[in-house]
From Swiss-Prot:
Organism the protein comes from: Shewanella oneidensis (strain ATCC 700550 / JCM 31522 / CIP 106686 / LMG 19005 / NCIMB 14063 / MR-1)
Primary site of residence: cytoplasm
PANTHER family tied to this protein: NAD KINASE (PTHR20275:SF0)
Listed name of the protein: NAD kinase
Cofactor(s) for this UniProt protein: a divalent metal cation
Catalytic activity: NAD(+) + ATP = ADP + NADP(+) + H(+)
Gene Ontology MF annotations: ATP binding; metal ion binding; NAD binding; NAD+ kinase activity
Function: Involved in the regulation of the intracellular balance of NAD and NADP, and is a key enzyme in the biosynthesis of NADP. Catalyzes specifically the phosphorylation on 2'-hydroxyl of the adenosine moiety of NAD to yield NADP.
Length: 292
């Protein structure tokens, strides 16, 4: 990879001391090397004067690379917006797990310098589009990087719904909800609910029922081009919703139909050269660690 970057956007978690410190270091380090640096307006005021503050959309439009400082939640929030542009996205971990944020906050310079010099790997992660229909009319929609989840608004309350794959009836469910996850999200909420890990290059979705009231129901993997339809029973209560990455919530009423399909948008995720997904699984999740 020989692509060079010229304009770089900085994105971070507002009012977070560790993030603020890393953003200041990044801004100074990048400007000293001659890069044009744009800072998301939510954090720009915390970095002092002489900062070019823009919104997230302008970062997507003008930047070659966006650096997200924070945890996976910050990365997901930025990714849902930036995926509609061609901008590459890389993360500096200032969160807990940091599954999508590769660079260490206290020693990012060496790895980032190589990335900026064109030594990096690129992954394209597809997103989901979630839509809520009521009496045939679209009522709400949004995108998700990790997962779209149908669930009740109150804890420990079962709901009833039917699931269709490409308009073919699959099954009826009585459960706490349903997770429809991308490969990116298969190491997140879907994993906690008992779903399989899908490697990022798979063109697939995984459907994971949440606490189904049955002894036989298991997660299922389907083609990424499939259209998932969930029809909510009219007998359910009214406090239902679809959550996209746990950040955006779409209201659902009894009788509504939820359509989840692959979005046309893709996140262009940048990794340092030699990025190893299985090493990330071992180091972040303690997966399959060597015994000797």
């Amino acid at each position: 990879m020989t692509t060079k970057f010229h304009t770089i956007g900085l994105i971070g978690k507002p009012h977070h001391p560790g993030t603020n410190q890393t953003l200041k270091r990044l801004h100074h380090w990048l400007t000293m090397q001659g890069y044009e640096v744009l800072v998301e307006e939510r954090v720009a005021t915390e970095l002092g004067p002489h900062i070019v503050a823009v919104d997230l959309l302008e970062i997507g439009e003008r930047c070659d690379l966006a650096i997200v400082v924070g945890g996976d939640g910050n990365m997901l929030g930025a990714a849902r917006v930036l995926a509609r542009f061609e901008v590459g996205v890389i993360g500096v971990n200032r969160g807990n797990l940091g599954f999508l944020t590769d660079l260490p906050p206290d020693a990012f310079e060496e790895a980032l310098a190589k990335v900026l010099d064109g030594e990096f790997d690129t992954e394209h992660r597809f997103l989901l589009e979630a839509e809520v229909y009521r009496h045939g009319q679209l009522k709400a929609s949004n995108t998700a990087v990790n997962e779209a989840v149908l669930h009740p608004g109150k804890i420990a309350h079962m709901i009833e719904f039917e699931v269709y794959i490409d308009n073919q009836f699959m099954y009826s469910q009585r459960a706490d909800g349903m997770i429809v996850s991308t490969p990116t999200g298969s190491t997140a909420y879907a994993l906690s609910a008992g779903g399989a890990i899908l490697t990022p290059n798979l063109q697939a979705l995984i459907l994971v029922p949440m606490f189904p009231h049955t002894l036989s129901c298991r997660p299922i993997v389907v083609d990424a081009c499939s259209t998932i339809k969930m029809v909510v029973s009219p007998e359910n209560g009214e406090n239902l919703e679809v959550s996209c990455d746990g950040h955006v919530h779409l209201a659902v009423l009894p009788g509504d139909e939820i359509i989840v399909r692959r979005s046309s948008e893709q996140l262009r995720l940048i990794h340092p050269k030699g990025h190893n997904y299985f090493h990330v699984l071992r180091s972040k999740l303690g997966w399959g660690s060597k015994l000797f």
